[in-house]
């Protein structure tokens, strides 16, 4: 067995891309076979300096990459984020500190670049807290039992003057980016999408590892003709024993910038002949969906889990980037064992905005940088975290003050997997 010091952790060279992909596929328990097309495709978007590998005697045994991203803070401001993905360690080389070394390199570079936060979607819950990440958003999936919804089976379109049309991938690529950006600017926790995202999700770029099946696309336009919603969905063509159609519509993604558009698209999906169930895909935990139905119990929660994990790299810029509903002052003692964002900070919130600055004043709360990330987007409760022993009140009532300042009326949501 090689010693950890004998394993080289570094950015990959172009000639090592195929070996890196093989290690990536192996780590995710996929076939290690690598095609020339996959090498060409991944080479088109990998950022060389931010694509790391761990090499043991020239063979790649761990993978890690990051890329630039914009994350929406509470209030709609965007902050630059270091988005992390494709993290694997081959089973033969686990527990040797390879992920720790790759993470340390990447976060140090992100801090130096001026990124405010790092983000990732965690495949396993226990891994990333030790690197200062906290679960900042959650997602919920519902399955709708269409016959139970109470919707009028004669529904034939929105009654608000808007309309729904089926469109093709080209139409989605034209209307989708601007629509999504409008949503992202108002949705804390949402992240930016590049052109490639739209190409992959409309079949322009086809991946060896994910065989492409053309989905259906439907667009909602308001009475004025403005695009306010889009949905991508598939149907499974299932028939029951008595020659009865029992199809399930699986939503790949649905974005809407108004409640009217969201309601109309869900009603449309539930109105399609032969559809008896609708799987919603990953939605915000406080999504309006169940309440768009006359019988909300027809939408049954099938999965609920943590989703976007955030690691704060710059406490001052992160806390000053977001908005707050109230006024007040809070002193936070932020513990960061990796030395990237720790310190004592005084947050002052008033009608003119927020000011955060280092301070020597007594702290009201002591918390790990990962817990601060969970609080930053407004989802977590400092009072609950204190009850769990994950936040320490140094001054009585400080957790309640933190909740009054940091919690939001709507929950953050990240619609994307990356």
Swiss-Prot record:
Matching Pfam families: Acetyltransf_17, Acetyltransf_9, SCP2_2
Residues involved in acetyl-CoA binding: 87-89, 95-100
UniProt keyword annotation of Acyltransferase present: yes
Domain N-acetyltransferase: 7-158
SUPFAM superfamilies per the UniProt record, alphabetical: Acyl-CoA N-acyltransferases (Nat) (SSF55729), SCP-like (SSF55718)
Enzyme Commission number, as recorded: 2.3.1.-
Gene Ontology MF: a single term: aminoglycoside N-acetyltransferase activity
Gene3D superfamilies reported for this sequence: 3.40.630.30, SCP2 sterol-binding domain
Active site: 128 (proton donor), 418 (proton acceptor)
Keywords assigned by UniProt, alphabetized: Acyltransferase, Transferase
GO BP terms: aminoglycoside antibiotic catabolic process
Subunit structure: Homohexamer; trimer of dimers.
Family, as annotated: Belongs to the acetyltransferase Eis family.
HAMAP family the UniProt entry points to: Eis
Listed name of the protein: Uncharacterized N-acetyltransferase SAV_4024
